[in-house]
Amino acid sequence: MLKRIVQAFFIIFGGVVGIFLIPELFVLLNIQDIPLITNAYTSAAIGAIIFFLISIWGTEYVVNWVKWIEDSLLKAPVPDLLFGSLGLVFGLIIAYLIVNVIPLDNIPYRIFSTIIPVFLAFFLGYLGFQVGFKKKDELISLFSISARMQKKKGTADEEHEVQDKKLKILDTSVIIDGRIADICQTGFLEGVIVIPQFVLEELQHIADSSDVLKRNRGRRGLDILNRIQKELDIEVEIYEGDFEDIQEVDSKLVKLAKLTSGVVVTNDFNLNKVCELQKVAVLNINDLANAVKPVVLPGEEMNVQVIKDGKEHNQGVAYLDDGTMIVVEEGRNYIGKHIDVLVTSVLQTAAGRMIFAKPKLLEKAL
Protein backbone atom coordinates (compact mmCIF):
# COMPACT_ATOMS: atom_id res chain seq x y z
CA MET A 1 0.00 0.00 0.00
CA LEU A 2 2.76 2.43 0.97
CA LYS A 3 4.66 1.56 -2.21
CA ARG A 4 1.65 2.42 -4.38
CA ILE A 5 1.15 5.70 -2.53
CA VAL A 6 4.78 6.65 -3.14
CA GLN A 7 4.51 5.74 -6.84
CA ALA A 8 1.32 7.79 -7.15
CA PHE A 9 3.10 10.73 -5.55
CA PHE A 10 5.97 10.40 -8.04
CA ILE A 11 3.53 10.35 -10.98
CA ILE A 12 1.52 13.35 -9.77
CA PHE A 13 4.67 15.28 -8.94
CA GLY A 14 6.10 14.40 -12.37
CA GLY A 15 2.94 15.65 -14.08
CA VAL A 16 3.11 19.00 -12.27
CA VAL A 17 6.81 19.38 -13.04
CA GLY A 18 6.16 18.43 -16.67
CA ILE A 19 3.56 21.18 -17.11
CA PHE A 20 6.12 23.83 -16.10
CA LEU A 21 9.37 22.43 -17.53
CA ILE A 22 8.52 20.39 -20.64
CA PRO A 23 7.43 23.48 -22.65
CA GLU A 24 10.86 24.99 -21.99
CA LEU A 25 12.41 21.78 -23.33
CA PHE A 26 10.27 22.03 -26.50
CA VAL A 27 11.56 25.57 -27.03
CA LEU A 28 15.14 24.36 -26.78
CA LEU A 29 14.38 21.56 -29.27
CA ASN A 30 12.62 24.06 -31.58
CA ILE A 31 9.41 22.03 -31.79
CA GLN A 32 7.15 24.50 -30.01
CA ASP A 33 5.08 25.09 -33.16
CA ILE A 34 3.52 21.59 -33.22
CA PRO A 35 0.09 21.92 -31.46
CA LEU A 36 -0.31 18.18 -30.96
CA ILE A 37 2.83 18.04 -28.84
CA THR A 38 3.08 21.48 -27.26
CA ASN A 39 0.09 21.45 -24.92
CA ALA A 40 -0.38 21.02 -21.18
CA TYR A 41 -1.75 17.48 -21.43
CA THR A 42 1.22 16.22 -23.38
CA SER A 43 3.65 17.99 -21.04
CA ALA A 44 1.96 16.49 -17.99
CA ALA A 45 1.95 13.03 -19.53
CA ILE A 46 5.63 13.19 -20.45
CA GLY A 47 6.56 14.42 -16.95
CA ALA A 48 4.44 11.70 -15.33
CA ILE A 49 6.04 8.99 -17.48
CA ILE A 50 9.56 10.20 -16.66
CA PHE A 51 8.91 10.26 -12.91
CA PHE A 52 7.13 6.89 -13.11
CA LEU A 53 10.31 5.41 -14.56
CA ILE A 54 12.30 7.11 -11.78
CA SER A 55 9.90 5.67 -9.19
CA ILE A 56 10.67 2.12 -10.32
CA TRP A 57 14.20 2.64 -9.02
CA GLY A 58 13.58 5.12 -6.19
CA THR A 59 10.39 3.81 -4.58
CA GLU A 60 12.15 1.15 -2.51
CA TYR A 61 14.53 3.71 -1.02
CA VAL A 62 11.70 6.09 -0.16
CA VAL A 63 9.57 3.29 1.36
CA ASN A 64 12.48 2.01 3.45
CA TRP A 65 13.23 5.54 4.64
CA VAL A 66 9.59 6.15 5.60
CA LYS A 67 9.41 2.82 7.45
CA TRP A 68 12.63 3.63 9.32
CA ILE A 69 11.16 6.94 10.47
CA GLU A 70 7.91 5.20 11.44
CA ASP A 71 9.73 2.54 13.50
CA SER A 72 11.86 5.18 15.21
CA LEU A 73 8.80 7.22 16.17
CA LEU A 74 6.91 4.17 17.43
CA LYS A 75 9.85 3.07 19.59
CA ALA A 76 10.41 6.53 21.08
CA PRO A 77 8.65 7.25 24.41
CA VAL A 78 5.72 9.64 24.29
CA PRO A 79 7.45 12.30 26.47
CA ASP A 80 10.40 12.31 24.04
CA LEU A 81 8.10 12.95 21.08
CA LEU A 82 5.96 15.48 22.94
CA PHE A 83 8.72 17.67 24.33
CA GLY A 84 10.85 17.28 21.21
CA SER A 85 7.93 18.46 19.08
CA LEU A 86 7.19 21.36 21.44
CA GLY A 87 10.83 22.39 21.27
CA LEU A 88 10.75 22.15 17.47
CA VAL A 89 7.63 24.31 17.25
CA PHE A 90 9.09 26.85 19.67
CA GLY A 91 12.31 27.03 17.63
CA LEU A 92 10.38 27.56 14.38
CA ILE A 93 8.32 30.32 16.00
CA ILE A 94 11.50 32.08 17.12
CA ALA A 95 12.92 31.74 13.60
CA TYR A 96 9.73 33.21 12.12
CA LEU A 97 9.84 36.17 14.50
CA ILE A 98 13.51 36.83 13.73
CA VAL A 99 12.90 36.71 9.97
CA ASN A 100 10.07 39.23 10.31
CA VAL A 101 12.19 41.57 12.43
CA ILE A 102 15.29 41.53 10.20
CA PRO A 103 14.84 43.67 7.04
CA LEU A 104 15.92 41.02 4.53
CA ASP A 105 14.99 43.22 1.57
CA ASN A 106 17.95 45.48 2.38
CA ILE A 107 20.45 42.65 1.90
CA PRO A 108 22.38 43.38 -1.32
CA TYR A 109 22.42 39.82 -2.66
CA ARG A 110 19.04 38.20 -3.25
CA ILE A 111 20.36 34.70 -2.62
CA PHE A 112 21.23 35.56 0.98
CA SER A 113 17.75 36.91 1.69
CA THR A 114 16.42 33.54 0.51
CA ILE A 115 18.92 31.32 2.32
CA ILE A 116 18.86 33.10 5.72
CA PRO A 117 15.20 32.23 6.57
CA VAL A 118 15.77 28.60 5.59
CA PHE A 119 18.96 28.41 7.65
CA LEU A 120 17.32 30.03 10.71
CA ALA A 121 14.32 27.70 10.48
CA PHE A 122 16.54 24.63 10.23
CA PHE A 123 19.02 25.71 12.93
CA LEU A 124 16.52 26.98 15.53
CA GLY A 125 14.10 24.13 14.83
CA TYR A 126 16.87 21.57 15.39
CA LEU A 127 18.09 23.41 18.49
CA GLY A 128 14.58 23.60 19.93
CA PHE A 129 14.01 19.88 19.29
CA GLN A 130 17.28 18.92 21.01
CA VAL A 131 16.59 21.13 24.04
CA GLY A 132 13.04 19.81 24.43
CA PHE A 133 14.18 16.20 23.95
CA LYS A 134 17.18 16.28 26.31
CA LYS A 135 15.57 18.41 29.03
CA LYS A 136 12.28 16.53 29.12
CA ASP A 137 12.91 14.98 32.57
CA GLU A 138 13.61 18.35 34.15
CA LEU A 139 10.60 19.93 32.46
CA ILE A 140 8.29 17.10 33.53
CA SER A 141 9.48 17.33 37.13
CA LEU A 142 9.14 21.11 37.19
CA PHE A 143 5.64 20.95 35.68
CA SER A 144 4.55 18.27 38.16
CA ILE A 145 5.90 20.24 41.12
CA SER A 146 4.30 23.44 39.81
CA ALA A 147 0.96 21.69 39.27
CA ARG A 148 1.06 20.25 42.76
CA MET A 149 1.81 23.65 44.26
CA GLN A 150 -1.04 25.24 42.28
CA LYS A 151 -3.53 22.68 43.62
CA LYS A 152 -2.66 23.69 47.16
CA LYS A 153 -3.42 27.37 46.55
CA GLY A 154 -6.80 28.59 47.74
CA THR A 155 -7.30 31.83 49.57
CA ALA A 156 -4.68 34.56 49.76
CA ASP A 157 -3.56 33.36 53.19
CA GLU A 158 -3.14 29.82 51.90
CA GLU A 159 -1.10 31.06 48.95
CA HIS A 160 1.20 32.96 51.27
CA GLU A 161 1.60 29.89 53.48
CA VAL A 162 2.47 27.64 50.53
CA GLN A 163 5.06 30.11 49.27
CA ASP A 164 6.68 30.18 52.69
CA LYS A 165 7.03 26.39 52.72
CA LYS A 166 9.79 25.97 50.19
CA LEU A 167 10.82 22.59 48.84
CA LYS A 168 13.37 20.87 51.08
CA ILE A 169 15.94 19.05 48.91
CA LEU A 170 17.87 16.34 50.77
CA ASP A 171 21.49 15.54 50.01
CA THR A 172 23.20 12.17 50.48
CA SER A 173 25.04 13.04 53.69
CA VAL A 174 21.94 14.16 55.57
CA ILE A 175 20.09 10.97 54.59
CA ILE A 176 22.91 8.70 55.75
CA ASP A 177 23.22 10.72 58.98
CA GLY A 178 19.71 9.62 59.93
CA ARG A 179 18.71 12.54 62.14
CA ILE A 180 16.60 13.99 59.33
CA ALA A 181 13.88 11.40 60.01
CA ASP A 182 13.60 12.47 63.65
CA ILE A 183 13.56 16.14 62.66
CA CYS A 184 10.72 15.47 60.20
CA GLN A 185 8.85 13.50 62.85
CA THR A 186 8.98 16.40 65.31
CA GLY A 187 7.48 18.76 62.72
CA PHE A 188 10.37 21.22 62.63
CA LEU A 189 10.80 20.68 58.88
CA GLU A 190 7.77 21.95 56.95
CA GLY A 191 6.89 21.73 53.29
CA VAL A 192 7.59 19.03 50.73
CA ILE A 193 10.65 16.81 51.02
CA VAL A 194 12.32 16.36 47.61
CA ILE A 195 14.66 13.42 47.03
CA PRO A 196 16.47 13.70 43.67
CA GLN A 197 16.93 10.56 41.61
CA PHE A 198 20.68 11.20 41.35
CA VAL A 199 20.91 11.18 45.17
CA LEU A 200 19.11 7.82 45.23
CA GLU A 201 21.57 6.48 42.66
CA GLU A 202 24.51 7.64 44.78
CA LEU A 203 22.97 5.95 47.82
CA GLN A 204 22.53 2.76 45.78
CA HIS A 205 26.19 2.84 44.74
CA ILE A 206 27.25 3.27 48.37
CA ALA A 207 24.95 0.43 49.46
CA ASP A 208 26.52 -1.83 46.81
CA SER A 209 30.08 -0.97 47.82
CA SER A 210 32.54 -3.75 48.61
CA ASP A 211 33.62 -1.80 51.69
CA VAL A 212 31.59 -3.00 54.68
CA LEU A 213 31.43 0.41 56.36
CA LYS A 214 30.28 2.17 53.19
CA ARG A 215 27.77 -0.58 52.44
CA ASN A 216 26.24 -0.28 55.91
CA ARG A 217 26.03 3.50 55.59
CA GLY A 218 24.30 3.22 52.21
CA ARG A 219 21.78 0.68 53.48
CA ARG A 220 21.13 2.85 56.53
CA GLY A 221 20.37 5.78 54.22
CA LEU A 222 17.91 3.70 52.20
CA ASP A 223 16.23 2.55 55.43
CA ILE A 224 15.94 6.17 56.56
CA LEU A 225 14.24 7.13 53.29
CA ASN A 226 11.87 4.19 53.59
CA ARG A 227 10.95 5.32 57.10
CA ILE A 228 10.35 8.91 55.98
CA GLN A 229 8.08 7.78 53.13
CA LYS A 230 6.05 5.15 54.97
CA GLU A 231 5.99 6.08 58.65
CA LEU A 232 6.05 9.89 58.77
CA ASP A 233 3.18 12.23 57.98
CA ILE A 234 5.10 14.37 55.51
CA GLU A 235 4.86 14.71 51.74
CA VAL A 236 7.79 13.25 49.81
CA GLU A 237 8.51 13.84 46.10
CA ILE A 238 11.06 12.01 43.94
CA TYR A 239 12.68 14.34 41.42
CA GLU A 240 13.21 12.22 38.30
CA GLY A 241 15.26 14.74 36.34
CA ASP A 242 19.01 14.86 35.96
CA PHE A 243 21.62 17.34 34.79
CA GLU A 244 23.71 15.33 32.35
CA ASP A 245 26.16 18.17 31.78
CA ILE A 246 27.05 18.21 35.51
CA GLN A 247 29.03 15.36 37.06
CA GLU A 248 29.15 16.18 40.79
CA VAL A 249 26.06 15.38 42.87
CA ASP A 250 26.58 18.46 45.05
CA SER A 251 26.60 20.71 41.97
CA LYS A 252 23.40 19.05 40.74
CA LEU A 253 21.75 19.76 44.10
CA VAL A 254 22.69 23.43 43.89
CA LYS A 255 21.35 23.63 40.31
CA LEU A 256 18.08 21.94 41.31
CA ALA A 257 17.66 24.30 44.28
CA LYS A 258 18.10 27.27 41.95
CA LEU A 259 15.56 25.92 39.43
CA THR A 260 12.90 25.20 42.05
CA SER A 261 13.75 28.00 44.53
CA GLY A 262 14.13 25.22 47.07
CA VAL A 263 16.27 24.76 50.17
CA VAL A 264 19.16 22.29 50.35
CA VAL A 265 19.15 20.25 53.57
CA THR A 266 22.60 18.92 54.45
CA ASN A 267 25.18 18.36 57.15
CA ASP A 268 28.08 18.64 54.69
CA PHE A 269 30.23 21.61 55.68
CA ASN A 270 31.65 22.09 52.17
CA LEU A 271 28.24 21.91 50.47
CA ASN A 272 26.99 24.41 53.03
CA LYS A 273 29.70 26.85 51.95
CA VAL A 274 29.04 26.27 48.24
CA CYS A 275 25.33 27.00 48.72
CA GLU A 276 26.15 30.23 50.52
CA LEU A 277 28.48 31.30 47.70
CA GLN A 278 25.83 30.43 45.08
CA LYS A 279 23.14 32.36 47.02
CA VAL A 280 21.14 29.17 47.56
CA ALA A 281 19.13 28.68 50.75
CA VAL A 282 20.58 25.90 52.90
CA LEU A 283 19.61 24.21 56.17
CA ASN A 284 22.50 22.53 57.98
CA ILE A 285 21.22 20.11 60.61
CA ASN A 286 24.52 20.48 62.45
CA ASP A 287 23.56 24.12 62.98
CA LEU A 288 20.23 22.94 64.40
CA ALA A 289 21.97 20.42 66.65
CA ASN A 290 24.38 23.09 67.89
CA ALA A 291 21.53 25.52 68.47
CA VAL A 292 19.71 23.16 70.85
CA LYS A 293 22.81 22.23 72.83
CA PRO A 294 23.06 23.69 76.33
CA VAL A 295 24.79 27.06 76.30
CA VAL A 296 28.21 26.99 77.93
CA LEU A 297 29.82 30.27 78.99
CA PRO A 298 33.42 31.00 79.97
CA GLY A 299 33.89 30.61 83.70
CA GLU A 300 31.32 27.82 84.10
CA GLU A 301 32.29 24.66 85.92
CA MET A 302 31.61 21.11 84.72
CA ASN A 303 32.70 17.57 85.50
CA VAL A 304 34.22 15.58 82.62
CA GLN A 305 36.25 12.45 81.99
CA VAL A 306 39.52 12.98 80.15
CA ILE A 307 39.85 10.08 77.70
CA LYS A 308 42.85 10.79 75.43
CA ASP A 309 45.72 13.09 74.52
CA GLY A 310 45.15 16.34 72.68
CA LYS A 311 47.09 17.64 69.69
CA GLU A 312 49.11 20.16 71.69
CA HIS A 313 51.57 19.49 74.51
CA ASN A 314 49.96 18.32 77.78
CA GLN A 315 46.42 18.66 76.40
CA GLY A 316 43.67 16.19 77.23
CA VAL A 317 40.41 15.59 75.40
CA ALA A 318 36.98 14.94 76.88
CA TYR A 319 33.47 14.80 75.42
CA LEU A 320 30.02 15.86 76.60
CA ASP A 321 27.06 13.51 76.25
CA ASP A 322 26.01 15.30 73.03
CA GLY A 323 29.43 14.69 71.47
CA THR A 324 30.87 18.16 72.00
CA MET A 325 34.67 18.03 72.26
CA ILE A 326 36.33 19.59 75.30
CA VAL A 327 40.02 20.39 75.06
CA VAL A 328 41.47 20.41 78.59
CA GLU A 329 44.71 22.36 78.97
CA GLU A 330 47.24 20.53 81.15
CA GLY A 331 44.81 17.62 81.16
CA ARG A 332 47.11 14.87 79.94
CA ASN A 333 47.92 13.79 83.51
CA TYR A 334 44.20 13.20 84.16
CA ILE A 335 43.53 10.71 81.33
CA GLY A 336 40.99 8.13 82.51
CA LYS A 337 39.85 10.28 85.44
CA HIS A 338 36.79 12.40 86.16
CA ILE A 339 37.78 15.95 87.05
CA ASP A 340 36.13 19.33 87.50
CA VAL A 341 37.12 21.87 84.85
CA LEU A 342 36.50 25.56 84.25
CA VAL A 343 35.48 26.71 80.77
CA THR A 344 37.90 29.26 79.33
CA SER A 345 36.43 29.75 75.83
CA VAL A 346 33.96 28.29 73.33
CA LEU A 347 34.57 27.96 69.57
CA GLN A 348 31.37 27.69 67.49
CA THR A 349 31.44 26.77 63.77
CA ALA A 350 29.05 25.21 61.25
CA ALA A 351 30.99 21.98 61.67
CA GLY A 352 30.32 21.86 65.40
CA ARG A 353 31.28 23.31 68.76
CA MET A 354 34.53 23.01 70.67
CA ILE A 355 35.03 23.93 74.34
CA PHE A 356 38.37 24.87 75.84
CA ALA A 357 38.80 24.37 79.58
CA LYS A 358 41.40 23.90 82.30
CA PRO A 359 41.37 21.76 85.45
CA LYS A 360 39.78 23.44 88.45
CA LEU A 361 42.52 22.00 90.67
CA LEU A 362 45.07 23.87 88.56
CA GLU A 363 43.07 27.07 88.92
CA LYS A 364 43.01 26.68 92.71
CA ALA A 365 46.74 26.06 92.78
CA LEU A 366 47.26 29.35 90.94
Curated annotation (Swiss-Prot):
Positions in coiled-coil regions: none
Protein name, per record: Uncharacterized PIN and TRAM-domain containing protein YacL
Domain PINc as annotated: residue spans: 169-280
Matches recorded under SUPFAM superfamilies: PIN domain-like
Keyword ATP-binding: no
Cofactor(s) recorded in Swiss-Prot or TrEMBL: Mg(2+)
Function (record text): An RNase.
